[in-house]
Regions:
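Conserved, hydrophobic alpha-helical core segments of structured domains
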Residues: 1-170
């Protein structure tokens, strides 16, 4: 646990990304992500380091994205630029950055797509290999009221629905 690492004096300086985890451990989003990780481990489910790192670094990405949107940048390029900035500042040349970066980027880039519940967007998104990770991330955001709970509920229902039910959900959105 983070508290135990702090108690042992091992909480900082070993690995730069661990420093970020410790630094963010008190934030609501990181707390719900860590609690969800503990739950998954307790249930014997796998935990992807990229998902946890995406949660820890989300505040940086969100701030950079918001700043770019305030300058009237287009949403997707603004998010891409914010992600690149965070990778350069926080991850650097960490071994495995390629896979970590790809997984994290995919989770983050799905977030604005979840807002679009019309047309073909939901059907394409739900077929993405990392859609479940993106949805789990969205659910954590809803848990701390960063996004509307109804949005996460809609996607939960959509992901489990038949094709006909999905059509109805899109029509109702």
């Amino acid at each position: 646990s983070i508290a135990q690492l702090k108690h042992l004096g091992l909480a900082t300086g070993i690995y730069p990304l661990l420093d970020v985890v410790v630094e963010r451990a008190d934030s609501a989003f990181v707390q719900v992500a860590l609690a969800d990780t503990d739950r998954r481990v307790g249930e014997g489910k796998p935990v992807a380091p990229s998902f946890l790192l995406a949660c820890v670094l989300w505040a940086d990405v969100r701030e950079g994205w918001a700043a770019r949107l305030a300058r009237k940048d287009h949403p997707y390029p603004a998010l891409q630029d914010a992600i690149d900035e965070v990778f350069d500042a926080r991850i650097g040349d960490v071994s495995g950055r390629g896979k970590l970066a790809a997984d994290m980027r995919e989770i983050w880039m799905m977030q604005p797509r979840f807002e679009k519940r019309v047309g073909s967007v939901p059907f394409g998104l739900v077929e993405q290999p990392r859609c479940r990770a993106g949805f789990d991330f969205l659910r954590l955001r809803a848990d701390i009221q960063e996004v509307d709970e109804r949005l996460a509920d809609w996607w939960q229902e959509f992901s489990m629905a038949s094709d006909a039910e999905r059509e109805d959900l899109v029509q109702a959105a």
